[in-house]
């Protein structure tokens, strides 16, 4: 929300409150309070940065305006409002059945909205814990040729970006994730660390809770100093205040603790536990001068009056200049740009934003359906009170007073529903946090905070107005004389009420159809997703992540020897059928490589620009995963690091070698001008879907070897988790400094691949079911009221010879006509709305005919049942009794 929009909102709020001020005082009152508001314009503009005290001060200002407006009202109005409230509460208590149903219906809608809003508030709306977070952005290399929008960059590129731009006040860098091993203590602990430039913390505008952050001098002299996260300080040092100056052994080397960050600080993710200067990175020497080493990510702070669009245009121009100045080959690097992403968007991701907004839209629909239901209940109850209102009008009560009476009752009902809804939301939030997939950012920040409480209060008052307007509108248009003469039953007022109720049913059905279509599409997508083959057999597989202390000296042959010994020892354990190691089974990175096929020109098919990932593996990993061999052979035990052989996956074979046998062909990594180190293709294996089941297969090349972080997988004949202790012991016996973590099973791993979609689909289906139940109850209520209103007519029909089946058709036909109109309207709306969730679908069109037809029949079936019960009751009407009663 922009500064101008924020101020307009508060100005609008003052003007709305001014409506209750007497007209003769209204102009002066508004001028006075608007002038007061303009004095606070600076605070309003900085709303996202204000502490709780200043936010409460602004809210108190609005409350003060409201109380002042009430104070200006005549005393008589205050007394009348108290009388209305007392009378309304008595009437609600007099009809406990109606009151209970209305409160529960509204509480479900309000509770669902509050629970989902609490998630949206924590993930999307709450400011990040930095100074002016809305001016922070991540800067990535944009590689259109490989379709990668967020690639890392090199240190020389960072220096050029920093010196050539005019719109960022500063740029800083950090590594792209740096797992380290804390080797001091009883056993090694693997934590996520980051190498960052000295200006990162000042750029973020965050000061340490203890000590200080490292300086440019620390960076220049390669000082081994470290800043700890609040969590690591508590866990590793027991929150000792004398931690500054103590040593912490990282990857076998001692670093001095110089600072501890605040409890709410994290960057770039909440997994990051410590920060070190960029110059102590194990890969710094030799790599920091490489123009095309993509080891770094860049964060920038926009100048006060700069926009993200302006920054994007400027950085694109800088990127183009650099690509032309430092090309490796025209084919490889020309056209590189820079992608500027607002930090909040970077943290949440566009798909998550869309999913949360879809869920928020779903609960809004549920709330509207609940309001329509309660409005129908209020209309039916209002019809029974027609004579009461007519008598009060005859005794001198004005229509305004009667309308205010009904709105007061609605507000009281909404207030109680809001309190119950808040309780349901509290339970719902706990359930959401418990069942939500762990990759939702800021999950631990989801709480019922003052902002959520304000939202609940606002929603409660809004619902009170929504369901109270229909009966209040009817009272304002009714003629007391007609009501007194006709007694309310079967009157023209009853006809108008049935028409209004019918309109609300149409709206309910349309909203329900829209929800059911969205849920149906998500269900069909999820079913399609579950049928996707992950490329390996997950049953009976144990996975453990193994990390060695990382250093430039401990790469290559030593690492390969370590993993070879571990694999041999684990393979000897009872029940183990096969063991292997792979660099990154979950493929936690983007394609970052390219190849050139021997004998092809630079512009030939399958040259350097295609998406490609290179993985180091042990010789028997495919046997452990049960990945099918399509052509050629697997690696042998003798083929280790530096062997000039590779295995490719099916996607790469199809893309680079269409219609030919790739076995025996040679490739090299990089473009045509790269070093001529050729690798022979000895095998083709099936594709592994490892990031997300719905993600398109990526071209992969597998090389024999190992790095310091590997996934160890063992296929066993019994329960995989029973082997955990033995595997830990074998790894520690080979190298006590190795950290073992991330233990899981293959089955659980595959479930995680679709956890986010399962969560979204489950919630949407739940809300759709609630909507269907509410719509069915609404149809039942309207048809039951219609039968009660037409008892006299039905009695006459039966007395004149109509059969029970005729009455049944009459009542069901009336309800089904309304439902049919609602379904048709909902299908048309769904045809447009379903396109908004296209990005969330997999293997299903947004206009899938089967889903639309299925939803229509489902709602028509539920409506048929809801209509049948009142219709069956109508067939039991005694003609003589109904005529005598009239």
Regions found by a protein language model. Name each.
Residues 95-123, 127, 369-371, 415-418, ...:
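Short, strongly hydrophobic transmembrane alpha-helices
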Residues 193-214, 224-354, 430, 522, ...:
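Mid-to-C-terminal secondary-structure elements
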Residues 116-141, 165-167, 207, 268-270, ...:
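Membrane-proximal juxtamembrane linkers immediately C-terminal to transmembrane helices
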Residues 128-178, 294-299, 533-595:
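Membrane-proximal extracellular/periplasmic loop immediately following the first transmembrane helix
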Residues 370-414, 777-819, 823, 836, ...:
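Interfacial "coupling" helices/loops that link adjacent transmembrane helices in transporter permeases
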Residues 73-99, 343-349, 377-404, 408, ...:
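Alpha-helical transmembrane segments of integral membrane proteins
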Residues 52-98, 148, 175, 179, ...:
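Membrane-helix entry/capping segments
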Residues 1-104, 481-495, 876-886:
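Negatively charged linear elements and acidic catalytic determinants
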């Amino acid at each position: 929300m922009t500064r101008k929009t924020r101020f307009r909102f508060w100005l609008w709020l003052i003007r709305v409150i001014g409506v209750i001020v007497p007209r003769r005082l209204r102009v002066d009152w508004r001028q006075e309070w608007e002038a007061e508001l303009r004095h606070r314009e600076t605070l309003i503009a900085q709303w996202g940065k204000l502490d709780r005290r200043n936010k409460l001060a602004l809210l108190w200002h609005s409350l003060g305006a409201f109380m002042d407006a009430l104070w200006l009202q005549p005393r008589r109005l205050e007394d009348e409002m108290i009388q209305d409230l007392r009378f309304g509460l008595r009437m609600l208590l007099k009809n406990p059945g109606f009151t209970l149903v209305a409160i529960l219906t509204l509480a479900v809608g309000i509770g669902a909205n509050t629970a989902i809003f609490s998630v949206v508030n924590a993930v999307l709306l709450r400011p990040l814990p930095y100074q002016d977070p809305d001016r922070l952005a991540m800067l990535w290399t944009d590689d259109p040729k490989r379709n990668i929008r967020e690639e890392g960059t090199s240190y020389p590129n960072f220096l050029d970006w920093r010196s050539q731009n005019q719109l960022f006040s500063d740029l800083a860098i950090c590594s792209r994730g740096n797992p380290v091993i804390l080797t001091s203590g009883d056993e090694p602990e693997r934590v996520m660390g980051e190498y960052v430039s000295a200006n990162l913390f000042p750029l973020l505008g965050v000061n340490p809770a203890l000590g200080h952050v490292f300086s440019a001098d620390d960076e220049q002299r390669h000082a081994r100093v470290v800043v700890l996260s609040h969590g690591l300080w508590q866990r590793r040092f027991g929150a000792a205040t004398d931690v500054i100056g103590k040593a912490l052994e990282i990857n076998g080397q001692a670093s001095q603790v110089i600072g501890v960050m605040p409890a709410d600080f994290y960057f770039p993710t909440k997994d990051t536990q410590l920060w070190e200067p960029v110059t102590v990175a194990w890969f710094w020497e030799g790599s920091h001068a490489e123009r095309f080493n993509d080891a770094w990510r860049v964060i920038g702070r926009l100048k006060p009056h700069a926009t993200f669009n302006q920054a994007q245009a400027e950085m694109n121009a800088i990127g183009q200049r650099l690509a032309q100045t430092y090309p490796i080959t025209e084919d490889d690097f020309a056209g590189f740009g820079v992608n500027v992403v607002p930090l909040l968007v970077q943290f949440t991701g566009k798909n998550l934003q869309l999913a949360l907004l879809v869920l928020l839209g779903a609960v809004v629909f549920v709330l509207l359906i609940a309001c329509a239901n309660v409005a129908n209940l209020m209309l039916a109850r209002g019809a029974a009170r027609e004579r009461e209102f007519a008598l009060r009008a005859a005794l001198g009560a004005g229509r305004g007073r009667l309308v205010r009476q009904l709105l007061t009752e609605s507000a009281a009902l909404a207030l109680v529903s809001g309190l119950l809804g808040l309780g349901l939301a509290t339970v719902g939030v706990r359930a959401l946090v418990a069942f939500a997939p762990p990759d939702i950012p800021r999950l631990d920040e989801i709480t019922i905070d003052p902002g959520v409480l304000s939202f609940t209060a606002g929603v409660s008052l809004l619902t009170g107005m929504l369901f109270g307007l229909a009966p209040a509108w009817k009272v304002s248009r009714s003629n007391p004389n007609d009501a007194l003469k006709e007694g309310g039953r079967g009157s023209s007022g009853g006809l108008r009420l049935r028409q209004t109720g019918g309109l609300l049913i149409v709206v309910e059905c349309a909203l329900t159809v829209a929800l059911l279509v969205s849920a149906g599409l998500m269900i069909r997508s999820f079913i399609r997703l579950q049928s996707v083959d992950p490329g390996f057999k997950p049953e009976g597989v144990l996975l453990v992540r193994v990390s060695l202390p990382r250093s430039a000296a401990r790469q290559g042959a030593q690492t390969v020897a370590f993993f070879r010994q571990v694999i041999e020892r684990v393979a000897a354990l009872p029940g183990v059928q096969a063991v292997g190691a792979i660099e990154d089974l979950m493929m936690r990175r983007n394609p970052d490589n390219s190849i050139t096929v021997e004998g092809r020109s630079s512009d030939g098919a399958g040259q350097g620009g295609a998406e490609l990932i290179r993985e180091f593996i042990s010789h028997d990993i495919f046997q452990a995963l049960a990945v099918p061999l399509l052509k050629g052979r697997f690696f042998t035990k003798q083929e280790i690091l530096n062997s000039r052989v590779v295995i490719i996956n099916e996607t790469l074979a199809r893309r680079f070698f269409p219609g030919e046998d790739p076995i025996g062909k040679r490739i090299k990594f990089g473009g045509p001008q790269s070093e001529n180190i050729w690798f022979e293709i000895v095998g083709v294996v099936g594709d592994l879907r490892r990031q997300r089941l719905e993600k398109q297969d990526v071209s992969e090349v597998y090389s024999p070897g190992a790095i310091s972080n590997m996934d160890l997988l063992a296929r066993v004949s019994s329960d995989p988790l029973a082997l955990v202790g033995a595997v830990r012991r074998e790894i520690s016996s080979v190298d006590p400094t190795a950290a073992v973590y991330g233990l899981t099973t293959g089955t659980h791993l595959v479930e995680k691949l679709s956890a986010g979609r399962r969560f979204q689909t489950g919630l949407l289906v739940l809300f759709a079911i609630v909507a269907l139940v509410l719509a069915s109850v609404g149809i039942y209520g309207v048809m039951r009221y219609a039968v009660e209103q037409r008892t006299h007519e039905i009695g006459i029909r039966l007395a004149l010879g109509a059969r029970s089946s005729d009455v049944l058709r009459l009542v069901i036909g009336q309800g089904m006509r309304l439902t049919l109109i609602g379904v048709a309207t909902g299908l048309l709306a769904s045809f447009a709305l379903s396109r908004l969730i296209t990005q969330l679908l997999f293997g299903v069109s947004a206009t899938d005919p089967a889903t639309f037809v299925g939803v229509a029949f489902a709602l028509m079936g539920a409506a048929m049942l809801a209509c049948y019960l009142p219709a069956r009751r109508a067939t039991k009407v005694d003609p003589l009794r109904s005529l005598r009663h009239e």
